[in-house]
């Protein structure tokens, strides 16, 4: 099959961004619990304070070391806005925060649909750095070197991408695996009757 016959129609969605935020100061979590509304802090159960935003639905775990783990953002912009909102809220309720927070993305989880049928048996045989045991798990696990991500690829053409540090890495990985699967003749177009509605 000529690669041009299968158009690239991938739809990619960022599902979750996990980031660490460094505040470069120690924090009094007991004072935060007493003054900031809608936070949870039970050091006997978990050493961090849990701060939830409703919209966007983002959770931050705040530790006395001044480190935060922020999860739930669907874009880098949403992540930055959420961190600013958390800092603003803490300051509003009397927390003395100095310096600028340093945000570092640790992991981006995304989903994608290539809108093709993937022959996983053939892909498992021809692709390097993969694991495919259909008796254990229906997806092929593919470790890509550049960008450094892990893709869970299903025969339906749907996939999960983990390990990216930037949103553009997700899009690059999806396009790269699509091109590779086409090159190896491991995909076929979805027939009209196979389309989901």
Curated annotation (Swiss-Prot):
Sequence repeats lie at residues 14-90, 105-181. Coiled coil: none annotated. Signal peptide: none annotated. GO terms for molecular function: DNA binding; DNA-binding transcription factor activity. Keywords: DNA-binding, Repeat, Transcription, Transcription regulation. SUPFAM superfamilies: TATA-box binding protein-like. GO terms for biological process: DNA-templated transcription initiation. It comes from the Archaea. The keyword Chloroplast does not apply. HAMAP family: TATA_bind_prot_arch (MF_00408). General factor that plays a role in the activation of archaeal genes transcribed by RNA polymerase. Binds specifically to the TATA box promoter element which lies close to the position of transcription initiation. Belongs to the TBP family. PANTHER family: TATA-BOX BINDING PROTEIN. This is TATA-box-binding protein. It comes from Sulfolobus acidocaldarius (strain ATCC 33909 / DSM 639 / JCM 8929 / NBRC 15157 / NCIMB 11770). The lineage of its organism: Archaea, Thermoproteota, Thermoprotei, Sulfolobales, Sulfolobaceae.
């Amino acid at each position: 099959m000529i690669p041009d016959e299968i158009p690239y129609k991938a739809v990619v969605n960022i599902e979750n961004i996990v980031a660490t935020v460094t505040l470069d100061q120690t924090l009094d979590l007991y004072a935060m619990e007493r003054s900031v509304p809608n936070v949870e802090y039970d050091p006997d159960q978990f050493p961090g304070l849990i701060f939830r935003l409703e919209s966007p639905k983002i959770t931050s775990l705040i530790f006395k070391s001044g480190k935060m783990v922020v999860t739930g953002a669907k874009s880098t912009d949403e992540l930055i806005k959420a961190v600013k909102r958390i800092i603003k809220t803490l300051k509003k309720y009397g927390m003395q925060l100095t310096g600028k927070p340093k945000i570092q993305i640790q992991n981006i989880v995304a989903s994608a649909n290539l809108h093709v049928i993937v022959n996983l048996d053939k892909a498992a045989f021809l692709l390097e750095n993969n694991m495919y045991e259909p008796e254990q798990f229906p997806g092929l696990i593919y470790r890509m070197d550049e960008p450094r991500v892990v893709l869970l690829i299903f025969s339906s053409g749907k996939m999960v991408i983990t390990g990216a540090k930037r949103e553009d890495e997700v899009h690059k990985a999806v396009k790269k695996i699509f091109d590779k699967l086409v090159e190896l003749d491991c995909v076929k177009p979805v027939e009209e009757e196979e389309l989901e509605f």
